[in-house]
Curated annotation (Swiss-Prot):
UniProt entry tagged with the keyword DNA-binding: no
Oligomeric and partner information: Homotetramer.
Lineage summary: Archaea, Methanobacteriati, Methanobacteriota, Stenosarchaea group, Methanomicrobia
Protein name: 5'-deoxyadenosine deaminase
Similarity field: Belongs to the metallo-dependent hydrolases superfamily. MTA/SAH deaminase family.
Functional description taken from the UniProt entry: Catalyzes the deamination of three SAM-derived enzymatic products, namely 5'-deoxyadenosine, S-adenosyl-L-homocysteine, and 5'-methylthioadenosine, to produce the inosine analogs. Can also deaminate adenosine. The preferred substrate for this enzyme is 5'-deoxyadenosine, but all these substrates are efficiently deaminated. Likely functions in a S-adenosyl-L-methionine (SAM) recycling pathway from S-adenosyl-L-homocysteine (SAH) produced from SAM-dependent methylation reactions.
Organism domain of life: Archaea
Amino acid sequence: MADIIIKNAYVLTMDPDAGDLKNGTVVIEDGKITEIGENTKENADTVIDAKGSVVMPGLANTHTHAAMTLFRGYADDLQLAEWLEKHIWPAEAQLKAEDVYKGSLLACLEMIKSGTTSFADMYFYMDETAKAVEASGLRASLSHGLIELWNEEKGEADLKEGKRFVRAWQGAADGRIKTMYGPHAPNTCSEEFLTKVKEEAHRDGAGLHIHVLETEAELNAMKERYGKCSVHLLEDIGFFGPDVLAAHCVWLSDGDIEILRQREVNVSHNPISNMKLASGIAPVYKMLEKGVNVTLGTDGCASNNNLDLFEEIKTAALLHKVSTGNPTALPARQVLEMATVNGAKALGTETGMLKVGKKADMIVVDMKKPHLTPCFDVPSHLVYSAKGCDVRTTIVDGKVLMDNYRVLVMDEEKVIEEARTAAEELVARANA
């Protein structure tokens, strides 16, 4: 007896060896995919009729700050320095642990409802984000943000907390939580500190999550301080490797791209955040052409302002067509790979495609909508027409988190109301 059978679906496997099924069945047992075919002889406790829908791998959001849902729309359309110094940083200074839990739970709710099944997060009070992930049923790679600012005492305290978090939560939530070390960026951490963090990560067998060359200001500051850019500094201290998740990577030279390729660094492309903050356009087309593993992330809600990865998918596809002057750049299936296969590789999860033996993280997208009719090409529709709100069912680790638009793992109204109250009180404290 299987646990779940999804039948009558268009099965978008994202498996290059298998292809898609126009009318197929997916069987789930003990948290894994056990069968994919036109039909099955199995019976199951739960049968989902997905007629008129697409079943596909869940999406991976490879860079966000979940608790920043509390800052959604708080300070928009400002210069970066003013945005940070006068609004975001003063508000963050007032954060309490319970705020981070409520903001993270709201983020998890939003992701469940829009098709994201795994995410990578870097922030503060990360025990609270981990608790939210545990409660929500999602999969996550979590890191405590380390911002040393050339202050040895602060750096030691941050690293101690980062190490504690990594060891406390690795493999928690039945293996759904992985932990990473999160040095903020090369322009906020000294090279000595970055080296220490890398050594600790190696000792713990943990990955590294870091911002790299998000802005031209970072590029200029690094050249002034070190005579080299962030990528070359990280390369020179032996920081890079397949265990590194580098967010943004906007201001890259061709030489930087070659280093990322050689070291098998995973890149998280955050096009909407980069556009909203006018940070620039990452050379994603070049990176993909060179074989760099490029994934997609939303960044935090303060600079997006939502966690809908379908928006990120469409934006990435369009942005790099216009920026390269090439309408064939980043075709639909390639962008879907960035959000699924590539994301799973970056996060080290056995997900990202529908294949027997893989973990059962998947979503059902309802195609019976006016804006999805008619449908001549499913991948194209998912990229250029679909929205997060078209996701009707979300499954992680073989557990149904949302069924036919109804979230099963939390009280949606309560989560929204508590987050709204926490955000209002937080901003009031910041402005007092």
